[in-house]
Amino acid sequence: MYPTSGCARVLMACPAPAMLRGPLLRPSTTAIRGLRGSPLLYHYAATSNSNMRYFSSTSRRWIKEFFAPPKETDHIVESVTTWKHPVFTEKQMKEIAIAHREAKNWSDWVALGTVRFLRWATDLATGYRHAAPGKQGVEVPEQFQMTERKWVIRFIFLETVAGVPGMVGGMLRHLRSLRRMKRDNGWIETLLEEAYNERMHLLSFLKLAQPGWFMRLMVLGAQGVFFNGFFISYLISPRTCHRFVGYLEEEAVMTYTHAIKDLESGKLPNWANQPAPDIAVAYWQMPEGKRTILDLLYYIRADEAKHREVNHTLANLKQGVDPNPYAAKYDNPEAPHPTKSAEIVKPTGWERDEVI
């Protein structure tokens, strides 16, 4: 399916020239051992402003820089985000747990059934399988055992789709607010910030791999189908869509939990001591000594857990009436209430009578 020769081709990993097989490659040879021939080109960058090519099988004229600095700008150095990520503590991130909200009505069952079908299809497409709940000690068949390459393929594919719901919901609520000439009561900002956060997950993983044409084609098809499907569904039932995203984030928390366990148990040796990309360090404000791929997975899992809570909470509200509890000021700030931080996490969401 993939070409087998030609170092100038973007999709294949070819042996590096002899003059480069020395100390220059030492930081990354471990990270990419066994991954040659992958449609994803693994590379490791020690610093964001380094021009040194630690690993790449693509000739210089074919390399596509995903994080190129601004061009033809005399005064602008970089773009600064408006949405600063809240600081998560190590204790908060390690307390995140797998959880499931039981379906209570037909809307919940539609959302849950759709998520389970999509999970099955995605697992099939990415060659993923984990032990069933209650059977964590059972060894997964060899063909389904995850490697660094398989994990990053799965992460990239999932994150390209995960940023769609927040953008669609925010866009439709924005248009609704304009059309009805009424306030949105804080929903738009939270939904757009969620989409932005998911995109930052993707950009972080793109520092570990460069997708080939087949992955890009899969993403194009999945995004086209999912965007339009979610668009129509949100017009019909926003509540069902938020419940769907809540269940989807439950699966995301489960996926990242399994990845963390694999890494901590030594099943992913190439990531054992690999530093997190600079873009991730800056976005999550990672402290010194806590800037590895393992730490990155903990941060992303905490994000997904928060999205799980937010969407389950939004699904519990009256969609066209209630204000967004995550963008609200409360009469008693000392009482437990929804926040953007991970200080308080309710996996199954806040009930309406708890926040409104």
Swiss-Prot record:
Residues 330-356 are annotated as: Disordered. The chain crosses the membrane at residues 152-172, 217-237. Keywords: Electron transport, Iron, Membrane, Metal-binding, Mitochondrion, Mitochondrion inner membrane, Oxidoreductase, Respiratory chain, Transit peptide, Transmembrane, Transmembrane helix, Transport. Its cofactor is Fe cation. GO terms for cellular component: mitochondrial inner membrane. InterPro entries: AOX, AOX_sf. Fe cation 1 binds at E159, E198, H201, E304. This is Alternative oxidase, mitochondrial. Fe cation 2 binds at E198, E249, E304, H307. It is a multi-pass membrane protein. Belongs to the alternative oxidase family. It comes from Ajellomyces capsulatus. GO terms for molecular function: alternative oxidase activity; metal ion binding. The lineage of its organism: Eukaryota, Fungi, Dikarya, Ascomycota, Pezizomycotina. Catalyzes cyanide-resistant oxygen consumption. May increase respiration when the cytochrome respiratory pathway is restricted, or in response to low temperatures. The keyword Mitochondrion applies. Its EC number is 1.-.-.-. It is found in: Mitochondrion inner membrane.
